[in-house]
């Protein structure tokens, strides 16, 4: 029996639409992600547990975990019956890589129980393919950080899919999920099919600045460059009073703020714990829409997916 944990992630990181993603972990040690337990069995079995298990499809063949198992068996050309327990601790449609958590944890667990027939690159390609079926297009900005850890730059080259880039260890990432759902597929549909040249140049300039600042350890420059000209102008309307929240938490002292993935989770960054705590409190009191919403002060999770049992 193998138990695997895959962490939540912040896709896009503001400036890097479909290009950047960071795995995160609350600084209090809480595991923010999904867990999957797998053991060999006589037939395929799936049990759903966890806080958000009631949001999963009743039909097991519509469950992401079943799709992962089915695709894995197809790739290795063997039918391996397994018993799987999914602990669904990530809210669906939260903008924190919920589906990626399940995909990464499941594929790594099945691969390990089968003595690793797929290598790291093959697994990552399969993760991206399954994510694409869920969201409408193949993208790695959640699965790559959840799998590999750290802050990932998505290249999608035939030989190199993703590369880890330096992150600022003194940064606190405050993430707030308001307790409502935003469909990734719908959030993608709202974006324009084409962008003006000046917007593309501006976004490229800031993305290049962020990468440069990350490697040269200029944290303030990196924070200034974390601006989203591609998705935020359109997706902000899907979030509860996002622009007001962004203005307020920047006044409190956030050095950056943006939409996590497709939303509705937002992230803010502070380089001081006291400021992070003030931002966290404001978000709890003003951004959460119901009792299921949450706020966490996080750091970048450099480990990524891991065996915990």
Swiss-Prot record:
Q: What is its main location?
A: cytoplasm
Query: EC number(s) for this protein?
Result: 2.7.1.39
Query: What Gene Ontology terms describe where this protein resides (cellular component)?
Result: cytoplasm
Name the pathway.
Answer: Amino-acid biosynthesis; L-threonine biosynthesis; L-threonine from L-aspartate: step 4/5
**Binding of ATP, residues:** 91-101
MF term (GO), any: homoserine kinase activity
Any one GO biological process? threonine biosynthetic process
Reaction catalysis annotation: L-homoserine + ATP = O-phospho-L-homoserine + ADP + H(+)
Record's subcellular location: Cytoplasm
Record-linked Gene3D superfamilies: 3.30.230.10, GHMP kinase, C-terminal domain
Q: Which UniProt keywords apply?
A: Amino-acid biosynthesis, ATP-binding, Cytoplasm, Kinase, Nucleotide-binding, Threonine biosynthesis, Transferase
| InterPro entries per UniProt | GHMP_kinase_C_dom, GHMP_kinase_C_sf, GHMP_kinase_N_dom, GHMP_knse_ATP-bd_CS, Homoserine_kinase, Ribosomal_Su5_D2-typ_SF, Ribsml_uS5_D2-typ_fold_subgr
Query: What functional role does this protein have?
Result: Catalyzes the ATP-dependent phosphorylation of L-homoserine to L-homoserine phosphate.
By sequence similarity, the record places it as follows: Belongs to the GHMP kinase family. Homoserine kinase subfamily.
The protein depicted here goes by the name Homoserine kinase
Which organism is this entry from?
Answer: Buchnera aphidicola subsp. Schizaphis graminum (strain Sg)
Q: Which gene encodes it?
A: thrB
